[in-house]
From Swiss-Prot:
Residues 1-23 form the signal peptide. Residues 873-895 are annotated as: Disordered. This is Glutamate receptor 2.3. Glutamate-gated receptor that probably acts as a non-selective cation channel. May be involved in light-signal transduction and calcium homeostasis via the regulation of calcium influx into cells. The lineage of its organism: Eukaryota, Viridiplantae, Streptophyta, Embryophyta, Tracheophyta. Keywords: Glycoprotein, Ion channel, Ion transport, Ligand-gated ion channel, Membrane, Receptor, Signal, Transmembrane, Transmembrane helix, Transport. It is found in: Membrane. Expressed predominantly in roots. Residues 604-610, 632-635, 852-895 are cytoplasmic.
Length: 895
């Protein structure tokens, strides 16, 4: 150690003497600049070497410049006040034109005020706190990256892996606190909670660190973001590994405050950090950088070059360029005029006449430095790329990059457009080794195995205990909770990728009665008395304002059930009810129309339709009506009469078969129709209705306009059946409102006399309740989907939603035993086409007959009767034909 210090001092003296002699021999203008640093630290060693190498390299490359920087070192002694004293001394006694440094953000906070008062630019290469930016001092320039820039890559990593909670761990000073406002805003953008902030004192003992780590161990959150100095981080992670916080399941993310100084951390501490992700300042490769690194390794093989050294190198170069461009005129300080009053030492410094001009030239300096593009934008450098590293064994491994505009990518030349929207984290980053040498991505949240069990509230029900039932074991006096909701929850817990310990706590009073309604039960989660609620808890918007629900594990809604009545009155005229009166009337008219038409076509040449008028009238009726039951004895001979009879036979066949089927249905089947068809009819009539006690339905009914006096609560299915069977006239209700799962259970027991007629309210279903922001919500919701898509869900439904009355259908396959239907009479519209067809045949037959009848030539008419389709006599035997012709002639003569 003493050898390194001696070597360091020799180098400083060497560079100082070299530059001083060069300035004197060449007649150059010497310009004093100050460096405020912690001389006895490793950082200071690297920084001072880089500053002097920068001066040497710059003037060697630019021997024509008229100015030469002379470095004056002020030792801050690792103290805020020491930094202020060193700066005052440099300005007052050395009249430095600018100050490089200081090292920490706290020291820079004081120096900014000094630089503002004296107009001396302060150029820092290591103060990264965003708080310094808020001071808005034009004389403070940051030749480094502000910490808030790395918030975006941190946000991208957390979003990529889907972690829902993050605990920041930061040092208790300006450096640690500065990043928090930006970090909080960034995490809120992606709905990530910060349940706790772990603040570590800068001089914390190992015991104090252990106490804080134990707090973190007992939290469910497993994602931690560490923002502190490298020396404190080394002790922190050694303790974390000792206490078991570097095991599988944990996630640690380090900011560049630690990663950039990883080479300064001892090997034991780096081994303890294995599996940690880190944000590292990206230094682009360049030929100048490679040459500088090679020269550094040859000159100082035992000293590790840091990014702060590169920034100090570039800051010194920028200062040399700016001083040369600003010129050498008016480099004095104006003294404060003594008016006889006491003047503070800060006021006694005077004002730099060179400072404003130097500041303007510094803001315009732009060049390609060792650390990348050097250009001040709003007083600081602007990064566009950060490197993502994974600590493995005793070193770091690059696993990707964060690029502004592209996000996380494996390679710098990779474009965001080349990554699919359905990509996984492996498309954005290379392989990661997590703490405990785990390969799978940690969930980021876990119930502490050494912590307490989850306190899960369950409702105390008196009815519909198939869903949730709370009993006491008479032997052990322990609480036994069963039911569909409980079994489904336990199946979901088994699907989680981690163990969850829990206990069911009934929501009841000391006397065993329920302690309130479901709103009261849900509110207990908001108050922190329960960690969750499991049961038949409906997902409602007003409840979601203070708790989080999982995905529904069973569909729900509110159904209206009413009593069913048989609309068919079984009396002595029941046989008339299958057909409507219109169809009856149309059928009778059709009978007479067909009979009369056949008579008109046949009576002149068919003896079966001739005779006395009374005989002919009876024949017409007999022929028309007998076709319903058997073929009539009368034969028809004309073509059109036969066509009409065929059409009529087909109509009668269809009509009689339909009548028979409808009458059989009326005589053998009991068709139940609801007494009420909708909720609006209940409101219009002012009927009394029932609802489930302790449910949200009461509020919904009041919103729809039901007065409190018309609402009757019930608890059990038996109470609901009693109220509906009594009816409103006997103190009962006209209808009852139940949620669909309860309704299925009710109809599985009382299916023969009740029916659901409407679903007036839609709700999401039953869900499990957790506190707002609980990471369990996402995991449990995914597990619900797994169970719902597996045969286990159907097994649970069959086990609990089973019929209790053997005559009832299965409530799973047929939840509504009386599906909606309209028992209607057969009407004319069902046979309209057939009736129209028969009518058309009648019209055509009568038209043809009229045409033949109106023929003037009787002989021609008789010939036509014999030869035309009006007669089918050609088909008759000759003897029979002669008899018919003689009869026709006789009849014609009588006309």
């Amino acid at each position: 150690m003493r050898t390194e210090k001696l070597f360091f001092c020799i180098l400083l003296v060497f560079f100082f003497c070299l530059e001083f002699n060069r300035g004197q021999n060449n007649g150059k203008t010497l310009v004093d600049v100050g460096v405020v640093t912690d001389v006895d630290t490793s950082h200071s060693k690297v920084v001072m070497l880089c500053i002097n190498m920068s001066i040497s390299d710059f003037y060697s490359s630019n021997p024509q410049f008229e100015t030469r920087l002379v470095v004056n070192v002020g030792d801050s002694k690792s103290d805020v006040v020491g930094a202020a004293i060193a700066a005052l001394d440099l300005i007052k006694n050395k009249q430095v034109k600018a100050i490089l440094g200081p090292w920490t953000s706290m020291q820079a906070h004081f120096l900014i005020e000094i630089g503002q008062k004296s107009r001396v630019p302060i150029v820092s290469y290591s103060a990264t706190s965003p708080i310094l930016t808020s001071l808005r001092s034009p004389y403070f320039l940051r030749a480094t990256y502000e910490d808030s820039f790395q918030v975006q890559p941190i946000k991208a990593i957390i979003k990529l892996f889907g972690w829902r909670e993050v605990v920041p761990v930061y040092i208790d000073n300006t450096f640690g606190e500065g990043i928090m406002p930006r970090l909080t805003d960034a995490l809120q953008d992606i709905n990530v909670r910060i349940p706790y902030r772990s603040v570590i004192a800068i001089n914390a003992t190992d015991h104090e660190i252990s106490v804080e780590l134990l707090k973190m161990m007992n939290m469910p959150t497993r994602v931690f973001l560490v923002h502190m100095y490298y020396d404190l981080a080394s002790r922190f992670f050694i303790k974390a590994k000792e206490l078991g916080l570097m095991e599988p399941g944990y996630v640690w993310i380090l900011t560049n405050g630690v990663i950039d100084d990883l080479s300064l951390i001892n090997e034991t501490a780096v081994e303890a950090m294995e599996g940690v992700l880190g944000i590292k300042t990206y230094i682009p490769k360049s030929p100048d950088l490679e040459k500088f690194r090679s020269r550094w390794r040859s000159l100082f093989p035992r000293v590790e070059l840091s990014v702060y050294g590169l920034w100090a190198y570039d800051a010194t170069t920028a200062l040399a360029v700016a001083i040369e461009e600003a010129g050498t005129n008016n480099m004095t300080f104006s003294k404060v005029v003594d008016t006889g009053r006491n003047v503070s030492e800060l006021e006694a410094l005077g004002l730099s006449q060179f400072g404003p001009k130097l500041l303007q030239t510094l803001l315009t300096v732009q060049f390609r430095g060792l650390a990348g593009e050097f250009r001040f934008f709003r007083g600081q450098l602007q990064p566009s790329v950060f490197e993502i590293v994974n600590i493995i064994n005793t070193g770091e491994k690059s696993i990707g990059f964060w690029k502004e505009g592209n996000g996380l990518v494996k390679k710098l030349d990779q474009q965001a457009s080349s990554i699919s929207a359905l990509s996984t984290w492996k498309d954005h980053l290379k392989h990661i080794v997590w703490p405990g040498e785990a390969d799978s991505v940690p969930k980021g949240w876990q119930i502490p195995t050494k912590g307490k069990k989850l306190r899960i509230g369950v409702p105390k029900r008196t009815g519909y205990t198939d869903l949730v039932k709370v009993t006491r074991d008479p032997i052990t006096n322990s609480t036994v909770v069963t039911g569909f909701c409980i079994d489904f929850f336990e199946a979901v817990i088994r699907e989680l990728p981690y163990d969850v310990s829990y206990e069911f706590i009934p929501f009841e009073k000391p006397d065993g009665k329920t302690a309130g309604n479901y709103n009261d039960l849900v509110y207990q989660v908001y108050l922190g008395r329960y960690d969750a609620v499991v049961g038949d808890t409906t997902i409602l918007v007003n409840r979601s304002s203070y708790v989080d629900f999982t995905f529904p594990f069973i569909k729900s809604g509110v159904g209206l059930i009413v009593e069913m009545t048989d609309p068919v009155k079984r009396d002595y005229i029941l046989f008339m009810k299958p057909l409507s009166w219109k169809l009856w009337l149309t059928s009778f008219i059709s009978f007479f129309l067909v009979g009369c038409t056949v008579w008109v076509l046949e009576y002149k040449r068919n003896p079966d339709f001739s005779g006395p008028p009374r005989f002919q009238a009876s024949t017409i009726c007999w022929f028309a009506f007998s076709t319903m039951v058997f073929a009539p004895r009368e034969r028809v001979f004309s073509f059109w009469a036969r066509a009409l009879v065929i059409a009529w036979y087909f109509l009668v066949l269809v009509l009689t078969q339909s009548y028979t089927a409808s009458l059989a249905s009326l005589l053998t089947s009991q068709k139940l129709n609801p007494t009420i068809t909708s909720m609006s009819s209940l409101l219009e009539k002012g009927e009394t209705v029932g609802y489930q006690r302790t449910s949200f339905i009461l509020g919904k009914l009041k919103e729809r306009g039901f007065p409190q006096s018309s609402l009757v609560p019930f608890d059990t299915a038996e109470e609901c059946d009693e109220l509906l069977s009594k009816g409103p006239k006997k103190g009962g209700v006209s209808g009852a409102f139940l949620e669909i799962p309860y309704l299925r259970l009710f109809l599985g027991q009382f299916c023969n006399t009740y029916k659901m007629v409407e679903e007036p309210f839609n709700v999401d279903g039953f869900g499990f309740v957790f506190p707002i922001g609980s990471p369990l919500v996402a995991d449990v919701s995914r597990a619900i989907l797994k169970v719902a898509e597996s045969p286990k869900a159907m097994e649970l439904e069959r086990a609990w939603f089973k019929k209790k009355e053997q005559s009832c259908p299965d409530p799973i396959t047929n939840p509504d035993p009386n599906p909606s239907f309209t028992s209607r009479q057969l009407d004319i519209d069902s046979f309209l086409f057939l009736f129209v067809g028969v009518l058309l045949v009648c019209v055509m037959a009568l038209g043809n007959f009229t045409y033949c009848f109106l023929a003037k030539d009787q002989v021609s008419y008789l010939d036509k009767v014999e030869m035309s389709p009006c007669s089918s006599s050609q088909q008759m035997p000759v003897k029979r034909k002669t008899q018919l012709n003689m009869s026709q002639v006789h009849d014609q003569d009588s006309l």
